[in-house]
Amino acid sequence: MSNKMWGGRFGEGPDAIMEEINVSIDVDRHLYAQDIAASKVHAEMLAAQGIIAANDAKKIGKGLDTILSEIRDDSFDFKRALEDIHMNVESRLGELIGPSAGRLHTARSRNDQVATDFRLYVRDIIDETDNALATFQHTLATRALEFAGTVMPGFTHLQTAQPVTFGHHLLAYVEMAARDRGRFADARRRLNESPLGAAALAGTSFPIDRHATAKGLGFDRPMANSLDAVSDRDFVLETLSAAAIASTHLSRFAEEMVIWTSPLVGLVRLSDKFTTGSSIMPQKRNPDAAELVRAKTGRVVGALTGLLVVMKGLPLAYQKDMQEDKQGAMEAFSALSLAIRAMTGMVADLVPDEARMKAAAGDGYATATDLADWLVRTLKMPFRDAHHVTGRIVAAASKQGVALHELPLSAMQAVEPRITRDALAVLSVEASVKSRTSYGGTAPKNVRAQAKAWLRRLEKKRTPD
């Protein structure tokens, strides 16, 4: 038995294996709201242009509203034999309103239909992701203000480098999330053109108004080339690229959470809400949420890589390969959404061990650079010379097994006789962070100002800029 939607050319129905590989309703059913919205706008345009009767357009609109309600209340019967969301909606529309349903597909192909639906879907995802990232930023900035003066070790190569404040560290991720939001916003601007009306690939001979349908669906304009409109998925690739970068930022933070919460490090404690136990070891508090955020980056990056491979060899215009554009992308967007929410929750509830942070901040001679800077400022020593002198002083402290601020002044003067007791004042971790007043530096007053500025910006406009 042939498929009644496209079966006029065929004498027999498809093989069961063909049906199985061809069907996409399990995935593209998630486009139902976008598909129905685009169909309603298309029908209204057809009537406005005199292509179909106004009464038919009215019936179509009411029927589509009924279908939308049925899907939302789980009473709609999705049929795999009808392949995809477009055919399922059209078939049900025919059951509801009769022959008028057949007029809906005038001047339209599933090629421009699915391209339109998926653009609308990805646009919605971008808006949802932007809101989630803004909430994440707000949570980070709130905690940054709270811990603007909390001293912790700053790291390079995962070795203690210089003291910073915990608030400063949190604000670094506010900045990263801002750039992530900017990338999503850029992708949205390029995405926001309508493929609807491009038909199969060459446009249509009907006097349609593509500007009207574009406006009705919130697009800035119709796409200018019908071949391009139906055959490219760069809007998905660009959004997945932004998602992959955002996910990588989250993964880096999640990795820090895993390290910081280890009993060997002990800088931070996550709440019970975001940790789990062990089935055999009753003492365990595992940072599973952070570990899963870290792992989900693979799903997002994998979706980007997968779609790049799907698209890389496709000639114009539409190819059925493009049916594989949705599942990986949808799973990636879902993974990113969950990861953002999980990280937001962890940040909101985490408790830093401020005493341990302060103690760790002084480990590894972390204020050595402050001594070198003192030599430059006070003794007018070239920085490279100051670096060498400080290195010798650190070696002396290491040999004696003491911290830099515990090294006797006489031992320092044995290396550089002009050093005075004033140099000792710069060697505390508090003095170190307080001195970093350059723009973007870790000084607590800087951190407070930046955190407050971000909170004002986020509460006022929720802008990524």
Curated annotation (Swiss-Prot):
Its EC number is 4.3.2.1. It comes from the Bacteria. InterPro entries: Arg_succ_lyase_C, Argininosuccinate_lyase, Fumarase/histidase_N, Fumarate_lyase_CS, Fumarate_lyase_fam, Fumarate_lyase_N, L-Aspartase-like. It is found in: Cytoplasm. GO terms for biological process: arginine biosynthetic process via ornithine; L-arginine biosynthetic process. It catalyses: 2-(N(omega)-L-arginino)succinate = fumarate + L-arginine. One of its GO terms (molecular function) is argininosuccinate lyase activity. Keywords: Amino-acid biosynthesis, Arginine biosynthesis, Cytoplasm, Lyase. It is an enzyme of class 4 (lyase). One of its GO terms (cellular component) is cytosol. Pathway: Amino-acid biosynthesis; L-arginine biosynthesis; L-arginine from L-ornithine and carbamoyl phosphate: step 3/3. SUPFAM superfamilies: L-aspartase-like. Belongs to the lyase 1 family. Argininosuccinate lyase subfamily. This is Argininosuccinate lyase. It comes from Nitrobacter winogradskyi (strain ATCC 25391 / DSM 10237 / CIP 104748 / NCIMB 11846 / Nb-255). The gene is argH.
